[in-house]
Amino acid sequence: MTYNNSQQFSAVIFAGGNSTRMGQDKSLMFGGVERIRQLCIDCGVVKIITLCGSEERVSMFEGEVWPDPTHCQKLSDVIRWVRGELPGPIQFIPCDAFDLDRDSLQSLLQSGGGVPLDSNSNRQPLLANCPADYQIGDGSSVNSLFDDLATIVIAGRSDSFSNYNEKSQLNERHQS
């Protein structure tokens, strides 16, 4: 099912990590969560939730902010929990989607569901677009949750779907 109305979506921004490998909190870098929230607003998404990790991080972000439930031990548990809490389609977005722009997000929202490929042809499950009727997988890894979603190839936009886990990746990307 393709959704042409972005208002039908809930956007869920992942901002709960410690970012120790980056040396700073990724949720605050390059405009951070606020930039991603604004992209969602610009695309017409009305329900935007930031998953902040611990309760202590709630005050760091604007809008609707949810701490991770204490029964969730890893990110796959949190994703499974969120899927149970939110009816309708969900667009997931990691806080380190530094290159995501409005046109790329709009393309994801209009994709009908799936997991986009980045510029290295890797599936980026933290940018999954989950249709309302999608049943999250049973595995314990984030990848396994979205195994049954199609791979989305958006011509000319794959750079927008990269994420960054180490400073060296960020340096390489922004020097080219």
Task: For the regions a language model picked out, list residue spans one by one.
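Nucleotide and nucleotide-moiety/phosphate-recognizing core
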Residues: T2-R123, D138, D147-S160, S168
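Short glycine- and hydrophobic/aromatic-rich loop-to-beta-strand nucleating segment
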Residues: Q124-A132, N163
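Aromatic-glycine-rich donor-binding/catalytic loop that engages nucleotide-sugar donors
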Residues: C130-G139, R173-S176
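Short, basic/aromatic-enriched C-terminal tail that caps enzymatic domains
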Residues: S162-S176
